[in-house]
A protein has these predicted regions:
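Basic, glycine/lysine-rich polyanion-binding surfaces/domains
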Residues: 1-108
Length: 108
């Protein structure tokens, strides 16, 4: 993500874990409630479309994506929701903070 202006998307619904496992490049099983994963979506031909961070909460996911591309990312996710089992909400009142652990700062 080159642009530092990001937006947060909340995605929830039936079989949401399996849904994301089938449309992102990273393994959803590596995701937990403590640390986000950096991942991407590709076209069926393998062409890069979007990259974002994904964080799992108890029964939903939060995606942090480039603000300039967030609406088209939402549209792309909706294309894969054939059964209309998921809900996607742009979180207008959410914002991003970066916190770096002291142990990581010492390495730089």
């Amino acid at each position: 993500m080159n642009n530092t202006d990001t937006k947060i998307i909340k995605v929830h619904g039936k079989n949401i874990d399996n849904f994301f496992q089938n449309i992102i490049t990273n393994d959803i099983n590596n995701l937990n409630t403590e640390n986000p994963l950096y991942t991407a979506m590709l076209s069926p031909q393998g062409k890069y479309l979007y990259d974002f961070f994904i964080l799992k909460e108890e029964n939903f996911f939060l995606l942090e994506a480039n603000a300039n591309k967030v609406n088209s990312l939402i549209d792309e996710i909706k294309r894969y929701d054939i059964r209309k089992d998921i809900s996607i909400e742009l979180q207008e009142n959410f914002y991003t903070k970066v916190i770096i652990k002291e142990s990581l700062v010492k390495d730089y």
